[in-house]
A protein has these predicted regions:
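ATP/NTP phosphate-donor binding region
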Residues: 1-77
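Accessory alpha-helical/coil subdomains and C-terminal extensions
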Residues: 3-4, 10-14, 32-43, 162-251, ...
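Short, ordered loop/turn segments at secondary-structure junctions
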Residues: 12-14, 90-91, 117-120, 249-250, ...
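Short glycine/serine/threonine-rich phosphate/pyrophosphate-binding segments
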Residues: 18-19, 93-98, 131-132, 253-255
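Short acidic, glycine-rich surface-loop motifs adjacent to enzyme active sites
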Residues: 82-94, 239-252
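Short Gly/Thr/Asp-enriched flexible loops that form oxyanion-binding sites at enzyme active sites
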Residues: 88-110, 256-263, 292
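Internal gly/pro-rich beta-alpha loop/helix module
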Residues: 114-189
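C-terminal non-catalytic interaction/assembly regions of soluble proteins
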Residues: 248-342
Length: 342
C-alpha cells in the first residue's frame, strides 16, 4: 500500500484566501492554519496537508518577479519533504507567475498546481472550494507511488492546463482561463480524468535546479493602426532595455513603414532581443507567410510561434537571466523548454 501523499499549500494572496465578515461587511484573510476545520471536505482526500502563507499576502496586481523568486524558494526548500505543491494566487496575473515558475524549475518531477478563484472562499456561491479541493486531489494523485503530474499547471473551473499555455480571458465568469493552443491536461466531472498522452513526462533523474536569476528589463509593444514613430522610438530607447515582446497582427504581421523597420533594426543592433508574438488569442506566428512579415524575418526577429504573451514574458526574463549569447538566446527561445510551444 502506497503512503499518503504530502501536499504543501502556499498562499500568496488573492481572492481565494478571503472570507466575508458579515457583521462588518468587509473581506478579511482566511485562516489557513485551520484549513481542514473550515473546509471539512479536505478530510476525504487521502493525503496529508500543510500550509504556508506569505507574511503579507499580495494582490496579484502587485506581483513582481521578486515574488516569483520567493515562491520558487519556498518550493525549493520544501521540495524533498513534500510530494506536491498547490500555490494559491490571485487570478489577474496567475498565468504570468505560473509560467515563470515553469521555466525556473529545471528537472521538475513533482506537481506544482496554481489555482485561485473569482469569489472569496467564504462566499455563498464561491468557486474557491472546488478549485482548491480538486487542485489538492490532482497534486496528490499517483500511480505506483509516482505523481501523475510532474510539471507546473493551472487548475480553474474543472480544467487542468499546462500553466505556460494559459491566459485569463474573463474577469467575471468562473471559467476565467483558457489554453488556446493546447488541450486541457485533465478535466474534473463525476470523475477526475487525466489526458495522460498530453502530460510532460519526467524522463530523467537529474537533480532539481531552480533558476532564480530573472532579468525584467523587458517590455511589451503592441502594434495598432496609427502607432506613431515618436512612440515607438521613445519605447525602443528606454534605458537598460534588454528585450521586447512585439505583439503583432495575425500570424506575425506588422507595418512595413520604412521608419518602423529602421527603428527595429537599430534596436537589434544595440543587442535588444525582439520576439514576435501574435495578438490573437489562438494561432501561431509564421514569419514570412505574408509580405508584411517577410521583412521582420529578414531583420532577424525571433518567432514566438504559438507562445502566449504571458509565457513569452516569463521565458524572456528567464533566458536573459542566464546571460546567454545572442545565438543561444535565439535558439532557446524558439525551442520548447517546458512544453510552452507546439
Amino acid at each position: 500500500m502506497s503512503k499518503k501523499a504530502h501536499i504543501l499549500i502556499i498562499y500568496t494572496g488573492g481572492t481565494i484566501g478571503m472570507v466575508k465578515d458579515y457583521k462588518l461587511n468587509v473581506l478579511k484573510a482566511f485562516d489557513f492554519d485551520n484549513l481542514k476545520k473550515n473546509i471539512p471536505e479536505l478530510n476525504l482526500i487521502n493525503c496529508k496537508i500543510d500550509t504556508i502563507s506569505f507574511d503579507e499576502p499580495l494582490d496579484s496586481s502587485n506581483i513582481h518577479p521578486n515574488d516569483w523568486v520567493k515562491i520558487a524558494a519556498i518550493i525549493e526548500v520544501n521540495y524533498d519533504n513534500f510530494d506536491g505543491f498547490v500555490v494559491l494566487h490571485g487570478s489577474d496575473t496567475m498565468s504570468y507567475t505560473a509560467s515563470a515558475i515553469s521555466f525556473m524549475f529545471e528537472n521538475l518531477s513533482k506537481p506544482i498546481i496554481f489555482t485561485g478563484s473569482q469569489l472569496p472562499i467564504g462566499d455563498l456561491r464561491t468557486d474557491a472550494k472546488e478549485n482548491l479541493i480538486t487542485s489538492i486531489q490532482i497534486a496528490s494523485s499517483q500511480i505506483d507511488g509516482k505523481p501523475i503530474i510532474s510539471e507546473v499547471c493551472l487548475y480553474f473551473e474543472y480544467k487542468l492546463y499546462r500553466a505556460n499555455r494559459t491566459t485569463k480571458i474573463n474577469a467575471e465568469h468562473f471559467e476565467a482561463f483558457t489554453s488556446p493552443n493546447y488541450p486541457a491536461l485533465a478535466e474534473s466531472g463525476v470523475h477526475l480524468k487525466f489526458n495522460h498522452d498530453l502530460l510532460l513526462k519526467s524522463v530523467n533523474q537529474d537533480k532539481l535546479i531552480v533558476r532564480k536569476e530573472l532579468n525584467n528589463n523587458i517590455a511589451i509593444l503592441k502594434i495598432f493602426p496609427g502607432i506613431t514613430q515618436n512612440v515607438v522610438e521613445s519605447f525602443l530607447n528606454a534605458k537598460d532595455l534588454k528585450g521586447i515582446i512585439l505583439e503583432t497582427y495575425g500570424s506575425g504581421n506588422a507595418p512595413t513603414s520604412e521608419w518602423f523597420l529602421k527603428l527595429l533594426q537599430n534596436a537589434l543592433l544595440k543587442g535588444i532581443h525582439i520576439v514576435d508574438v501574435t495578438q490573437c488569442v489562438g494561432g501561431s506566428v509564421i514569419l514570412g507567410q505574408y509580405e508584411t512579415s517577410i521583412q521582420l524575418q529578414e531583420l532577424g526577429l525571433i518567432s514566438g510561434f504559438d507562445i502566449t504573451t504571458e509565457s513569452a514574458v516569463a521565458k524572456m526574463m528567464y533566458l536573459l537571466g542566464l546571460e546567454l549569447s545572442d545565438q543561444q538566446f535565439r535558439e532557446l527561445f524558439m525551442t520548447s523548454l517546458r512544453g510552452e510551444l507546439n
